[in-house]
Structures are given as C-alpha cells and as structure tokens.
C-alpha cells in the first residue's frame, strides 16, 4: 500500500512540470505565479529531513512541513522546538533551494480544535515553527470538530471566538492561518466576516468542493483572491490527476489567472 501511494505521488510530481496549473503565467512575467509544494506527511516523511531531497529531485518549489503528530498528546510531536533540528531543517532547505510554503497542523484532522483547552499553546507552537522556517502561512483544518457545528449557535460562537484569537496572534506576527472547512464558498465568506481577523484566511481544498458536487471554479470566484491564502490540489475519486475527469485543471488555471491569484499549490492525497 505504501509503495503504491509513494509511486503515484512520484508520478504526479514528475508530471508537474508540464501540467498547466504549474506554469508561469505569461512569458513576460518575472515572478513565478504558481509554486508547487508537497505535504511531507503525505509522502511518509512527516518532519523528516529527507522530504527536502525528494521534493528537490522532483523539481518542486517547496515543502509543506507538518507540526508532527498530536493524537492524545498535550502538544504536537514537534522537532522544530529543538535548536539542533531548527538548524538542520533550515540548512537542508537552503541546500536544496526550497521554500517552506506553510506549516501544517494536520493533527486537527483527528483532534477537535473546539475541544482542546490549550488551543492557543498549540497554535503558538506552530507560529514559532513558522518563524524558525520563515513560513508565512499555517494550515489549520477544522475536520476534527464534530460535523454540524456551524448550525449550532453556541458551538459556532466558540469556533469564531477561538479563530479570532489565534488569527489575531498570527496577524501580530505578520503571518496568516489558513483554515479548511466543509462549508461552501458562501459559508466560508460568512465565517471569515464573523471572525473578522486579518490573520485568518481560507486554505482551499479542491476535494471538498468536488465531493460535495460544487462547481470548483465558481467556488474560487466567490471566495476571491484575497480570501484564499493557499490551495490543496487534491481529489480522491480513484485516479491520478491527468485522468481525473471531474477536475479540469486548464479551467482551474484560467479561473485563477483571471482572479489574479498568486501563491503556492500543495499536493496532498494523490491516488491511483
């Protein structure tokens, strides 16, 4: 199973150079519009130095580093608190000329951000790791919160309160936390307005729109370029991206071009 997952991740990334979404938008453009990052935990290298060499060999632009496992731990299993690993990760990224596009708190896929009393400490740990690796975006999935929270006033109020607090923490350090929800684009826009923090934006995930039968490009347009900090280019319909009939990458690229969006696109779940 691991061999198949690894093989298909390699295949997708090798194809990345000729994939339209990854191209520089316009021959006269000096700055690369779309940069490609790979999530380290999805190539079985969560907080492992080897992720940099692999992404370099595949001509990627950066790595989305995870904070480490969470589970029932009080804090993330995070190596980036230790000076030795801080230096090692920085030097390795520099060696391979790779950016750390974002720092991910993927532990919140399984653990509820709403139920963690020490949520500020966990986010502060991430903000510190971002400073260490010079990353400007954090990834915070809300998947661990029990479904339906957005329709229960007391739960929604608490989620908004917590996101406002950590968003302001991020903004004070000049960085952004990108949240992933199961809401549609209009729902995300409403949530962002309620949070009202410059430190919270949307980390848009293709899979959520596609699995819920939403028009992916319309969702992107509704959100607009200023509300999307980064994108997870992923789907789980059973095929690799070049053969995915419900994900039209040419159309997605044209949509992002028209929106004027510039940023990093991270690959996560890539399956055969």
Summary of predicted features, one role per range:
Residues 92-99, 109-202, 210-211:
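Active-site acidic/histidine proton-transfer and metal-coordination neighborhood
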Residues 268-272:
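Conserved small/polar residues in nucleotide/adenosyl-binding loops
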Residues 51-68:
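Catalytic domains of carbohydrate-active enzymes, especially glycoside hydrolases
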Residues 31, 52-57, 80-101, 125-134, ...:
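Acidic (Asp/Glu)-rich catalytic clusters
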Residues 34, 52, 63, 160-253:
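Acidic/histidine-rich catalytic cores of soluble enzymes
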Residues 34-39, 63-65, 100-105, 138-140, ...:
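Hydrophobic faces of well-ordered beta-strands that scaffold small-molecule active sites
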Residues 1-7:
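N-terminal export leaders
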Residues 66-88, 145-147:
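Glycine-rich, proline-tolerant flexible connector loops at the mouths of alpha/beta enzymes
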